[in-house]
UniProtKB/Swiss-Prot annotation:
One Pfam family here: NUDIX
Protein species of origin: Aromatoleum aromaticum (strain DSM 19018 / LMG 30748 / EbN1) (Azoarcus sp. (strain EbN1))
Protein name from the UniProt record: RNA pyrophosphohydrolase
Free-text function comment from the UniProt entry: Accelerates the degradation of transcripts by removing pyrophosphate from the 5'-end of triphosphorylated RNA, leading to a more labile monophosphorylated state that can stimulate subsequent ribonuclease cleavage.
Gene Ontology MF terms in the entry: mRNA 5'-diphosphatase activity
């Protein structure tokens, strides 16, 4: 399901533990790491899609997490042409995402990367809140910057968490 501009509706999940470290998943049979994410099915709300993806990719149920916040609007990224299947190149541009910030209220042992018949990750770890900016694949970096910065205002209520010096200029949220 694509919108008129060629973007697939999607949800992204930033899952934090009690130390405000983020869940970081290693894509199966690859050397890349990312946050859980996935498409919104027809008739599904972003929140319903988020809970479905959370279970499919991480094995967590609604009782294992608390929703702390979500982005105000859609954040978009374009997928490089050479990554797009030939038959989709004239219609598909990338993803548009609503991002959710979740707190793990369960235990680390509740995480199960094999909850689905098609696992996305084969390893995971907790990382510093800003580490994903250094490690995510380049074409997703701006969306990660926008989501992390916007949701840091919710997570670190006393004042927004400062990104590392190298990312301060990059972390400004740009309105679409």
């Amino acid at each position: 399901m694509l919108d008129r501009e060629g973007y697939r509706p999607n949800v992204g999940i930033i899952l934090v533990n009690t130390r405000n470290e983020v869940f970081w998943g290693k894509r199966i049979r690859e050397h890349s790491w990312q946050f859980p994410q996935g498409g919104i099915k027809h008739g599904e709300s972003p929140e319903q899609a988020m809970f479905r993806e959370l279970f499919e990719e991480v094995g967590l149920r609604p009782e294992h997490v608390k929703i702390l916040g979500r982005t105000r609007g859609w954040l978009r990224y374009d997928v490089p042409k050479h990554w797009i299947k030939r038959e989709w190149r004239n219609t598909y541009r990338g993803q548009k995402q609503i991002w959710f910030l979740l707190r793990l209220v369960g235990r680390d042992s509740d995480v199960c990367l094999r909850a689905s018949t098609h696992p996305e990750f084969d390893a995971w770890r907790w990382s510093d809140y800003w580490v994903p900016l250094e490690a995510v694949i380049e074409f997703k970096r701006q969306v990660y910057q926008q989501a992390l910065f916007e949701l840091s205002k919710t997570l670190f209520r006393t004042r927004p968490c400062d990104p590392p010096e190298a990312y301060k200029a990059l972390a400004e949220v740009r309105e679409p």
